[in-house]
């Protein structure tokens, strides 16, 4: 999968000409840092238009990208584009790699090149939106996601990313609506369901948030996001013993949930759950320090 750092929209989509667009991170487990990737299709030259070595070069570049070997993938995409400058998929994929390497402006430029070559394909808009989010260009990102949703109102990735944008703008009711719509559009999209629950937490609807988080944990017992969210919620509601039990599991699954800055900037939690989890960690040091696997 392709992962970019520093923010958490669901996913840019990887180009593989001739493939059908796949769904993104359906179980939600890959969405907890950067961008959870969907191995789908960015627009571009059909596979049949590449002969032997050129097709192999494209596949090498794609494989390196999916493996997270971004520094190795970038020059491979450069070579592909030297041979096929009209290949929209290659432009979009190179843009994804540039974003993963921290070059959001370069990523936006590459996605624009992809759009100019295949104006009606949604993936470059999704990918450009993630890069715009990395730069805090919320309105520009929202415009890209809405462009997709005007054409496909059930695009779960665009709905989820628009929810993140709404949250960044402080509109948590709209964010929750988008997350819930993303979860309906893609059954099994656990991160969307968790984000909707956390938005309910932010809005003071603790019973609804607790119901959603418990349902997620029953279905995905190893889903750290839901366990960390339920830890914060239970602490806020005064159920400290059960909060500690869930924290043992959450922190063992993913220690980044100890980091408030990561929660706010990368995972994109709302502020109220972050504050509650910080209070839990400050006032329940025995839970924060307990070795993984030791239950209260």
Where are each of the predicted segments found?
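N-terminal leader/linker segments that initiate helical-solenoid repeat arrays
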Residues: 1-78, 82-83, 292-296
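Terminal, low-structured helical/coil segments at or just beyond the last alpha-helical repeat
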Residues: 10, 249-296
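Conserved alpha-helical positions within TPR/SEL1-like repeat arrays
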Residues: 55-66, 75-78, 89-100, 109-112, ...
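Structural marker of alpha-solenoid helical repeat scaffolds
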Residues: 83, 117, 151, 184-185, ...
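TPR/TPR-like (Sel1-like) alpha-helical repeat modules
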Residues: 218, 224, 228-258
């Amino acid at each position: 999968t392709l992962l970019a750092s520093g923010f958490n929209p669901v996913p840019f989509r990887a180009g593989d000409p001739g493939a059908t667009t796949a769904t993104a991170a359906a179980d939600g487990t890959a969405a907890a840092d950067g961008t959870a990737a969907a191995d789908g299709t960015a627009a571009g030259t059909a596979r049949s238009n590449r002969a032997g070595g050129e097709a192999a070069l494209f596949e090498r570049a794609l494989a390196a990208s999916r493996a997270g070997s971004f520094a190795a993938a970038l020059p491979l995409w450069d070579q592909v584009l030297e041979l096929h400058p009209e290949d929209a998929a290659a432009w979009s994929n190179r843009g994804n790699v540039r974003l993963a390497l921290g070059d959001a402006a370069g990523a936006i430029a590459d996605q624009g090149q992809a759009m100019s070559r295949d104006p009606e394909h949604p993936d470059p808009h999704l990918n450009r939106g993630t890069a715009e989010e990395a730069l805090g260009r919320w309105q520009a990102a929202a415009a890209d996601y809405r462009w997709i949703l005007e054409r496909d109102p059930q695009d779960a990735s665009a709905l989820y990313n628009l929810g993140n944008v709404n949250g960044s703008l402080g509109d948590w009711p709209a964010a929750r609506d988008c997350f819930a719509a993303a979860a309906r559009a893609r059954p099994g999209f656990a991160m969307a369901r968790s984000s909707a629950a956390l938005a309910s937490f932010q809005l003071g609807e603790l019973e609804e948030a607790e119901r959603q988080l418990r349902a997620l944990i029953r279905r995905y017992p190893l889903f750290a996001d839901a366990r960390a969210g339920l830890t914060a919620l239970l602490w806020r509601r005064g159920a400290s013993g059960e909060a500690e039990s869930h924290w043992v599991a959450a922190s063992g699954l993913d220690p980044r949930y100890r980091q408030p800055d990561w929660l706010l900037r990368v995972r994109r939690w709302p502020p109220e759950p972050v504050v509650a989890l910080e209070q839990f960690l400050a006032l329940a040091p025995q839970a924060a320090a307990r070795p993984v696997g030791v239950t209260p």
